Amino acid sequence: MSQPQLTQEALAREAALPENLWIQCPYCKQGSYRESLGNAQVCPHCHYGFRITAKKRLSLIATATEEWDADLVTSDPLDFPGYTEKLAAGQAATGLKDSVWTGQATIGGQSCALGIMDPKFMMGSLGTVTGERLTRLFEKATSANLAVVLFCASGGARMQEGIHSLMQMAKVSAAVKAHSNAGLLFISVLTDPTMGGVTASFAMQGDITLAEPHSLIGFAGRRVIEQTINQKLPQNFQRAETLLQSGFIDAVVQRQDQPSYLGDLLALHTA
């Protein structure tokens, strides 16, 4: 039996369809129309927050902003093969010079120092400029008597910068400690993914630690752990909800609720 032939009208309608009309949620695996994700880019089935750029998140979370240290640019200290090209690709994809945006912002009517790591820039990896901007964020917040809100998203330390990258863990942590010693609030918001050296340092040093639904949060990856202990891990291992049940974080907050939730926390701290 021969297959029916598509008419010219049907072919024209097919050609007129936009590309990437559907998108699959990486967590629940359900398919959705892209339009159904809304401006916040959230899965309508499980509320997983899709990975977004720092500038997109900034538009969702803050009503007034002033960027700090935007002129800092990463060099290539180890002359690592292909690194310059990766930096250029990250800059083109995000509009940032490195993997973090920092500055002063208003969230829910409350002024604070704000940092947003960008998973679209080399998976938000921690390099020298990212570490320097975060360090300056906490130092300026301490001087200005401001609380800090930091959205973490990272695959960990940036291997292309070697020991220069690893040093940022201690440097940022020292600035966080000085900010804490001044009696100021630090709210850490863990998004998908928050892994490696970022989790092992400043991401988990917040006075209040929040997370987005189903975010992957941990140090080593799942496969590495399973191969090390020779056991299969639970399905939701390293997910935000499991960390909440274990007491590692304080709350899981949906992306749409974050401006008001953070605004309330900041208002309570300054009252």
UniProtKB/Swiss-Prot annotation:
InterPro entries: AcCoA_carboxyl_beta (IPR034733), Acetyl_CoA_COase_Trfase_b_su (IPR000438), ClpP/crotonase-like_dom_sf (IPR029045), COA_CT_N (IPR011762)
Molecular function GO labels: acetyl-CoA carboxylase activity; ATP binding; carboxyl- or carbamoyltransferase activity; zinc ion binding
GO cellular-component term (any): acetyl-CoA carboxylase complex
All copies of domain CoA carboxyltransferase N-terminal, residue ranges: 21-271
Note describing how the cofactor binds: Binds 1 zinc ion per subunit.
Entry's EC annotation: 2.1.3.15
Enzyme class: transferase
Chief localization: cytoplasm
Pfam families: Carboxyl_trans (PF01039)
Protein name: Acetyl-coenzyme A carboxylase carboxyl transferase subunit beta
Protein species of origin: Lacticaseibacillus paracasei (strain ATCC 334 / BCRC 17002 / CCUG 31169 / CIP 107868 / KCTC 3260 / NRRL B-441)
